[in-house]
């Protein structure tokens, strides 16, 4: 079941998701041992490893340009994607090219190309723009690069309020997913699913 504590991590827009997922979610696994052992942990735990959530740890943080501004908040993020939960819940979100992809954040944002990043957004409703993707994923992951704080908010995609994850996102940070009705551009709440591998970490 989805706990009260988990519901508190999602935004108001996602509260209805929690209600739907509560009927199907597996009991969350225990938090990682290193978090349990911390005394007086901050409200949003920070990790020395900036790519702690990465699905592919071959990512080279030193190659990221310009100097990234790392996200330090714990709010829910979202990602529109064409892959269904049978794939994402098993694999997480893997980047297209961790080794040889475009590491410059501005170049990656302005021109869609293979990169070590997986994009997410602060904006729950952005899926309405990318509704043809088919699914709106809810993500609770530490870190990520705040794109607008890194390259400014005057670029043409600034309204997407992106958080880019170098190395992608491991499956345990995906809360769940709602399919999107491509006609009405709304989430099909009755078909939302929770991720049995999701592990709360804060």
PLM region spans:
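NAD-dependent ADP-ribosyltransferases
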Residues: 2-13, 29-202
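C-terminal segment of classical bacterial N-terminal signal peptides
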Residues: 19-28
